[in-house]
Amino acid sequence: MTLTTKHFDVEIPSIGFGTWQLKGDTATEAVKTALETGYRHIDTAQAYENEKAVGDGIQAAGSAREDFFLTTKVWTDQFKDGDLQSSTKESLKRLGVNEVDLLLLHWPNDDVPMEETIGALNDARKQGMTKNIGVSNFTKDQFDKAVELSDAPILVNQVEYHPFIDQTKLLAEAGHKGSALTAYCPLAQGRVFKNETIKMIAERYGVTPAQIVLRWFVQQPGVVAIPRSSNPEHIRQNFAIDEIHLDGDEMARISALRMHHDRIVDPDFAPVWDNPLAA
């Protein structure tokens, strides 16, 4: 069964397959395994330099195009009007598809006016390159501005989100605007496996810490998670969470870990992040 969250009449599979840092044959085999396992949401990006490999994995799995949700992201050096559309066409060629389901701006870029970039993103949608549009790594204020500037709904804000980071503000704002929040690094690059709270809950259910955390995500309204793995067994385990049902206390105990506010992805070009403690 594919768990989904619905936004602006669009059904987004709640567990997707992330492909960051997967390259070449490894990416191809991982995507093939994911689709054969039952994943119906694949996430890639121009900057990952694996769109061709991801497309090969899609083809190898033999999945009908209408049966899965495909996301890619435009890199910041392609944010000018014209550049964005041209680069998206190249992405489609590499992926071997006529359109993606979701096209995201990968990071905010203050060097190009947001009005221009959001306009170009909407134009790519009007030209049939993507069904939906969204953003990634946008702060609350940047997200609000993107929503205000866009003709089409901003379906998603994709951000770092795991049990050890406080994204309460972005979650609330996405919900207020009707958008989804997609979590990358949902397993905190393996840190969830070492946490005693998560390990204890996993032992109670007889499942992995990863499965517990992914279930924690899908039980939050409007949240999507995109775990990544090149290990076939882990790919299959991460998808097998239908039979897990966390109670309110377990959800709260995992959510309380956000007090650590431990951010993993913070490059030099990142925006000034929202302060979870500020009013």
Where are these regions (language model features)?
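N-terminal binding-site loop/beta-alpha segment at the start of enzyme catalytic domains
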Residues: 1-68, 277-279
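Alpha-helical scaffolding within the catalytic cores
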Residues: 1-5, 52-59, 87-90, 140-143, ...
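Acidic-and-aromatic substrate-binding clefts and catalytic sites of carbohydrate-active enzymes
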Residues: 23-25, 45-53, 77-82, 110-113, ...
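Short, acidic/polar
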Residues: 23-35, 80-95, 116, 143-144, ...
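Residues at the N-termini of beta-strands
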Residues: 41, 99-102, 132, 156
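A short, structured active-site edge motif that brings together acidic residues
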Residues: 65-79, 99-108, 137, 161
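CE4/NodB-like, metal-dependent polysaccharide N-deacetylase domain
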Residues: 84-104, 123-127, 149
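Beta/alpha (TIM)-barrel catalytic core signal, keyed to glycine-rich beta->alpha loops juxtaposed to Asp/Glu
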Residues: 108-279
